[in-house]
Amino acid sequence: MTWPLIIILIVLIIGVLTFFYFQPKQLAKTESIYTDALNAMVRGDKRTALKHLRDVVKQDTNHVDAYLQMGDILREEGNAQAAVKIHQSLTVRPNLKNDVKLHIHKSLALDYEQLSQLAKARREVELLLKLDKKNLWANEFLLALFEKQGDWDKATQISKTLQKVKKIQDSNQ
């Protein structure tokens, strides 16, 4: 009666040892890699930053900040079309915080501006303003957009809004 128990115990030990031996080596922690990417960005080493950011999103597909930074770097490197794809894919994610949504729409506006798709850039800024009507950057961007297009009526209107926003921000400081 003890022989079957010993055989089961030996098989169990061999199974556990095999599991741990063939288990993939633990990858570096996502946050550590993300920190390395941010450090590379600070140093101006965008290629290394992009490599680290790709590693982060391979390990954690929910790391929205890594995707945002990746898209921003691609745009800065002249690949705005790839940046649009990355940033656009983030818009369909559920349960994003407002500050993340603001960053996504800002990035998309800049992507579209670089591609000279001003109507789409405007749409993204307007979506941003729906989330935060007093966003200084968005109002200034929209003003510059209307000035580029020669739409002076809308530029005047935004200019007035911008003055109000600046007054509110000055009084809060």
Task: Indicate where each model-derived feature is located.
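N-terminal signal-anchor transmembrane alpha helix of single-pass membrane proteins
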Residues: 1-26
